[in-house]
Amino acid sequence: MTWFIDRRLNGKNKSTVNRQRFLRRYKAQIKQSISEAINKRSVTDVDSGESVSIPTDDISEPMFHQGRGGLRHRVHPGNDHFIQNDRIERPQDGGGSGSGNGQASQDGEGQDEFVFQISKDEYLDLLFEDLALPNLKKNQHRQLNEYKTHRAGFTSNGVPANISVVRSLQNSLARRTAMTAGKRRELHALEAELETLSSSEPAQLLEEERLRREIAELRAKIEKVPFIDTFDLRYKNYEKRPDPSSQAVMFCLMDVSGSMDQATKDMAKRFYILLYLFLSRTYKNVEVVYIRHHTQAKEVDEHEFFYSQETGGTIVSSALKLMDEVVKERYDPGQWNIYAAQASDGDNWADDSPLCHEILAKKLLPVVRYYSYIEITRRAHQTLWREYEHLQAMFDNFAMQHIRDQDDIYPVFRELFQKQSANQSA
């Protein structure tokens, strides 16, 4: 008889392979649930895990069953109202005695939505799937690292989903062979001695009995060697290796003027938090430059960018001028892939909008890989949007999107950073 002893330290992950299969099978429904859930989160809670709900109808398995129509014979418990062969009238729709306030239905059963928890890593992987920085190219000098997963031999620790059955059985065979080799040689010698002794005359019964006992003991010891042990287990090892890719810098330009109310600022912050998570999740050492502006623009750190209360009038060109200065000072376009994301409510001093058009057309768009403008407003577009529309017609690396409310943030983000196909990038 063979005994299997489960000594795995990671027993809680025994269903990992089933979980991964489930995530692959219902990816579309899960991504839909995630896109709806992200809009309900607070600004500071964008990157945690998520409880995902899927309608039961979407995960139900096909099955054969009897139809609702026709005549069928059933056996019911006895009662004091009916006897054998009595006909029971079919109840009218709505004739039930339930306590609910909804409309009656002929369907008497139902199920709640299926709800399960996904981890932070699973959540972010699904959130940013198929997204990439547009027009990213390799430059001549320093590089950032984009990590990709590669096979890297075998390891003695891992999750059950990565176990290598063939390598584990090979180790099991080698261990059992090594542990029982001496006993098997001794067993063969005793069996040969017993065979010789049995054919000799006169019979030596006591000696034969002793040999049989020793043979039985050796066989028992050999059988007690476990078929497989924790020591034998080998898991496929995967490691993340840097995949050379060009270094990049992202400029985040946010309007904090008085016309931007708190709700509009929160939507802008949500967009930039998504952008930051996407960059940090997908690429290593991408530099981010934060610029806040009202009548004056200022380069700030991450904390001040998201939490400063400073406000004022609106001159958008101040942020574009500052970006141009920073690019010339620190980021040579020949060595860097330069990106920018600008968020505003569209309000701007009327005489300043043509200047914004000029700065972008002559100084920034010729050197950046991609420039995205997001206008957050429910009002009609003003001069800044109209000036930028001319730029969109002139430059392929300029994109504009309109956000009206919180539900538009994630779809707009995916639209701006959707991974391009080979034909599109060419």
Curated annotation (Swiss-Prot):
Listed Basic and acidic residues bias regions: 78-92
InterPro entries hit by this protein: UPF0229 (IPR006698)
Record field: transmembrane: none
Pfam families registered for this protein in UniProt: DUF444
Region (Disordered): 78-108
PANTHER family for the chain: UPF0229 PROTEIN YEAH
Protein family membership: Belongs to the UPF0229 family.
NCBIfam families, sorted: PRK05325.1-2, PRK05325.1-3
Protein name, UniProt field: UPF0229 protein YeaH
Gene designation per UniProt: yeaH
